[in-house]
Amino acid sequence: MMCIWKLLKNLISKMAKVIISFLGTGGYSDRESKCRGEYRETTYFIDNKEYINSFVSDVLFKHYEAEKIIYIGTLKSMWDVVYDTYVDTPNDEVWENIAESINSFNHQTDLSKGNDIIKSFDKTIICPILIRYGLNNQENEENIKQLFEIEKLLNSGDEILIDITHGFRSMPIVLVGVLNFIIENFKKKIKISKISYGMFEISHEMEGRTPIVDLDVLLELQANAKASHEFSEYGNAYIYSE
């Protein structure tokens, strides 16, 4: 009995909430003068709680008591700001190397050039995934391959919370497709539990406050579509009962 309890305890301890977010270029960063720009700070509110922050992902991380953040971004994304934000004792030389690299990169740069950026987040809660711009099918296929690396960062039982506030608008669609494939075809029992969006565009109508919108209805629609397919094709109503 004790062995079973220890096994259950170990399984529970491995389960975690993981934020997956997209990282943009942060239009307020002055790369030429190496100014450490960032997203504009605002007062986010979610579940009747307020958080003053620049990153929606950081708000979600704290609000849901997550374990780590997987940031998906290009070589031009503001990794320097993320480094400043999440590394306990930032090294100015490391930051400068990141900033200079970002400034020199473009859409044609090979993703392997960003290996030093990835290494700079070792032993932190940040897990970077580098992607291309997705300008054509070849780049989109490469991005899909990159996103499959997320599977290695997840443990069985993990809950995924997706933040779609920033980054290229096409990427959340690609991400959800990849995650659904991982969920259906890999042995890890992971699930997407939430999709959120920081609606900064209407903060001027909300007295400067920015709502974090819950888009879980999309997950429900997807689940219903799957259940309908199972029922119509195989007469299986089990998923409906869930």
What are these regions (language model features)?
Residues 2-159, 174-242:
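Long, low-complexity, Lys/Arg-enriched
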Residues 25-26, 166-168:
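Short glycine-rich anion-binding loops that position phosphate/pyrophosphate groups of nucleotides
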Residues 171:
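Conserved TIR/SEFIR loop-to-helix hotspot centered on a Trp-containing motif
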